[in-house]
């Protein structure tokens, strides 16, 4: 079993391997429920059980793609395996692989074409591609507030302004704190352009179950690491 993707059962036994992972569709709209195609499966006998728990591990992205899943159903088609699963753990967000496949070398702010929570796919793609980065792109950080249209686009823009394209800064203030705390030793300058309108965009779209996540909370946190200039 030498495919770059491997599936393990809940006893950590290797049950199959394959050479390509295709994100098919989040067809129900239910969180974490989606379908994939496992391409070029290396085993003739598929040793999987419906309604079972499994783990996917792969050689790509230094293990950042790995996740656990519950297998609802599957079928074999032309040497490929189509599966219906619920993802139960991991930092991978469905759609991140497709984002990288079609926009890996795109230097523009590709999240601007994504609506609402779909921006989490870009954030997850940033984590897959670059992980936790340590090198800041510029001596002065410039946040372009005109590109912040909602809560999640703030995290896209912040990661972009600090680390560059596909810069990962998380999708919550707890994650921002952890990353900045490990990255910044002394305060550096941060210019936030079009700050007022971006504050409104953030505050009007904070998810209902997110507490202490307003623009005011963001400024309090960033002030510990930056000399902030609001424009």
Residue ranges: model-predicted function:
Residues 199-231:
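Helix-rich interaction surfaces within compact, conserved domain-sized segments
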Residues 3-6, 107-165:
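Extended, compositionally biased accessory segments flanking or bridging domains
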Residues 143-146, 171, 187, 210:
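Extracellular beta-sheet-rich ligand-binding/adhesion modules
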Residues 165-177:
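Extended catalytic/binding region for NAD+/ADP-ribose chemistry, centered on the ART fold
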Residues 139-141, 186-194, 226-228:
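Hydrophobic beta-strand segments of well-ordered beta-sheets in folded domains
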Residues 1-3, 8-113:
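Phosphate/adenylate-binding glycine loop and adjacent helical scaffold
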Residues 174-207:
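Short, structured protein-protein interaction patches enriched in aromatics and acidic/basic residues
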């Amino acid at each position: 079993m030498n495919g770059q993707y491997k599936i393990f059962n809940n006893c950590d036994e290797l049950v199959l391997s394959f050479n390509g992972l295709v994100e098919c569709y989040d067809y129900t709209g239910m969180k974490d429920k989606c379908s994939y195609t496992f391409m070029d499966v290396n085993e003739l006998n598929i040793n999987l059980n419906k309604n079972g728990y499994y783990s996917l591990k792969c050689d790509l992205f230094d293990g950042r793609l790995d996740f656990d899943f519950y297998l609802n159903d599957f079928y074999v088609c032309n040497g490929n395996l189509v599966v219906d699963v619920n993802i139960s753990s991991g930092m991978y967000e469905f759609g991140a692989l497709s984002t990288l496949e079609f926009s890996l070398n795109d230097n523009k702010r590709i999240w601007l074409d994504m609506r609402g929570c779909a921006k989490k796919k870009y954030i997850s793609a940033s984590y897959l591609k670059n992980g936790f980065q340590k090198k800041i792109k510029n001596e002065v950080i410039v946040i372009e507030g005109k590109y912040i249209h909602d809560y999640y686009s703030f995290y896209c823009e912040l990661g972009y302004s600090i680390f560059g394209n596909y810069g990962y800064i998380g999708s919550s203030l707890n994650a921002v704190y952890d990353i900045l705390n490990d990255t910044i030793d002394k305060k550096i300058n941060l210019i936030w352009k079009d700050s007022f309108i971006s504050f409104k965009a953030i505050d009007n779209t904070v998810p209902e179950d997110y507490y202490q996540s307003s623009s005011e909370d963001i400024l309090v946190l960033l002030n510990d690491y930056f000399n902030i200039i609001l424009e």
